[in-house]
């Protein structure tokens, strides 16, 4: 996957989160679960300044760190990733 494709993919994820579209967000996770979950958390972290309101960045960092830690212990990585995105959806302001 090229860098442009990955960047566009994260834009799709942030759009689904901003729109509070659980179905689209979950579909994104399902389509990307073959990636290492740690790389998804890192990808969101790397793209946050482009997509997240500045006042929400500290909250996003805490959520990502928490779910990345939990990732080491969970049986179902997809469920953990969807839970993370749901918490971001509920607590982080995404730029329009």
Task: Annotate each PLM feature.
Residues 1-16:
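Conserved alpha/beta core segments of nucleic-acid transaction machinery
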Residues 12-96:
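Helix-rich C-terminal "collar"/helical-bundle subdomain used as an assembly and partner-interaction module
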């Amino acid at each position: 996957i090229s860098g442009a494709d990955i960047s566009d993919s994260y834009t799709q994820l942030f759009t689904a989160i901003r729109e509070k579209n659980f179905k689209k967000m979950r579909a994104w996770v399902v389509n990307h679960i073959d990636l290492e979950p740690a790389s998804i958390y890192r990808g969101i972290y790397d793209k946050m300044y482009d997509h997240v309101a500045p006042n929400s960045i500290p909250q996003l960092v805490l959520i990502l760190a928490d779910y990345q830690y939990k990732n080491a212990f969970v049986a179902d990585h997809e469920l953990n990733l969807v839970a993370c995105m749901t918490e971001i959806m509920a607590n982080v302001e995404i730029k329009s």
